[in-house]
Regions:
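Short beta-strand-loop/turn "lid" adjacent to the catalytic site in phosphate-handling enzymes
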Residues: 55-118, 153
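Glycine-rich phosphate-binding/hydrolytic loop that grips phosphoryl groups
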Residues: 274-303
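Glycine-rich phosphate-binding loop plus the immediately following alpha-helix
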Residues: 37, 108-142, 147-202
Length: 303
C-alpha cells in the first residue's frame, strides 16, 4: 500500500519535488537547477536517485510530470489527444517501475488542422480544478509559451499556445527595440496598460511593436518604461487573439502562474473588462496528488 506520494515536476531548466502524505498535505519540498537540458543522455535515473532516493521507501508512489516525458527526457510519454481527463492520462502513464515510478504524458490538440501540445501544464490545470473543487473552467497559464485551455466536465477539451514570453525576450533583447529597453526593469503599470490598449487598435502587432521604437525616439518612453510597454503590447495581443475562442462569459476564467506574471494578466484583463481570478498558490502538487488519488483511491483519500 502506498503511504505517500513523491511528486516531481521535471522541466527544461529545473527539477522540483514534493513529498506528500496520503491526505494531500505537502511535507517537504526540494528544487534544483537541473532540468532535462542539464542531464546527460542515460543519466536520468542516476539524477533522480541522487535527489530523491531518501524519499523512495518501499511504500512510495512517484509521479513525474513535465519535460521528463519528452523525447529528450527520461522516457517519452506520448501525447494524449484532447479531450483528456485523469482516466485518459492514467491509461497512458509510462512506468519506469510498475506501480512505483510513472511518467505523466502531455496533451495534444488540433486547431484548424495544426497540432498544439503541452507538457506539465495539464497537471497544473487539474491541480487548479482539484483545489477549486470545480469541473468546468477556462484557464490561462502565462509563461514563455502561454496556454489558454478549456475544461468541460473535468476534461481538457482544447487549448492554444501563444509564444508571448519568448517574443518578449526576442524583442526586448535581440531586436532594434533592445537599444532603448531595460528588459528586467520593474513593471510600470500605467505604461503597461498603454501598451495593452494600443494592442487593441487596428494595425496588428507587427505595426504596434515599432511604436516602442518611435516613442523612445521622441522621448515619450524611457528604457525603464519601454519594457512595460512592450509587455503590454504582447499580452494585450495574446488576450485579443484568445478572446475569439473563449467559452461563454458564464464560464469562470482563472490565471495560473507566478505572482508577477499573473498580476500583469490580471491588470490587462481588468482594463479589457474581462473577469478573471488569479491563483497564486502552487497547484502542480495538487494536480499530481489528484492523479495519484485517481490511480489508487484507497491509498490517497480525498478529505
Amino acid at each position: 500500500m502506498h503511504q505517500k506520494l513523491v511528486a516531481v515536476d521535471w522541466g527544461t531548466s529545473s527539477l522540483r519535488g514534493a513529498l506528500i502524505n496520503s491526505d494531500g498535505a505537502v511535507l517537504e519540498k526540494r528544487a534544483f537547477p537541473q532540468g532535462i537540458m542539464q542531464v546527460a543522455h542515460g543519466q536520468f535515473q542516476n539524477v533522480f536517485e541522487q535527489r530523491f532516493a531518501d524519499w523512495m521507501t518501499d511504500d512510495m508512489l512517484c509521479l513525474v510530470s513535465g519535460m521528463a516525458g519528452s523525447r529528450q527526457g527520461w522516457r517519452e510519454a506520448p501525447y494524449c489527444p484532447c479531450p483528456s481527463g485523469f482516466e485518459d492520462i492514467a491509461q497512458h502513464l509510462q512506468w519506469i517501475e510498475k506501480d512505483r515510478i510513472g511518467i505523466v504524458p502531455g496533451l495534444s490538440t488540433f486547431n484548424d488542422a495544426t497540432p498544439d501540445v503541452m507538457r506539465g501544464e495539464e497537471i497544473q490545470i487539474f491541480g487548479a480544478l482539484n483545489t477549486l473543487k470545480i469541473e468546468t473552467a477556462q484557464l490561462v497559464l502565462p509563461g514563455t509559451h502561454s496556454k489558454w485551455a478549456k475544461v468541460l466536465n473535468s476534461k481538457i477539451t482544447d487549448f492554444k499556445t501563444f509564444m508571448t514570453g519568448e517574443f518578449y525576450a526576442l524583442l526586448s533583447q535581440h531586436s532594434i527595440l533592445a537599444k532603448t529597453c531595460l528588459p528586467d526593469a520593474p513593471l510600470k503599470k500605467e505604461v503597461f496598460l498603454e501598451g495593452v490598449m494600443q494592442s487593441q487598435k487596428p494595425g496588428g502587432l507587427l505595426h504596434h511593436a515599432f511604436s516602442a521604437r518611435s516613442l523612445a525616439l521622441f522621448e515619450k518612453l524611457n528604457p525603464a518604461q519601454s519594457s512595460s510597454y512592450i509587455s503590454g503590447l504582447l499580452i494585450g495581443e495574446e488576450i485579443k487573439s484568445a478572446k475569439s475562442s473563449m467559452q461563454s462569459d458564464s464560464t469562470p476564467l482563472f490565471i495560473l502562474g507566478n505572482s508577477q506574471l499573473t498580476q500583469r494578466y490580471a491588470f490587462a484583463m481588468d482594463a479589457l473588462e474581462l473577469s478573471a481570478q488569479a491563483l497564486a498558490d502552487e497547484v502542480t502538487w495538487s494536480g499530481l496528488w489528484a492523479l495519484a488519488h485517481h490511480l489508487y483511491p484507497d491509498h490517497f483519500k480525498l478529505s
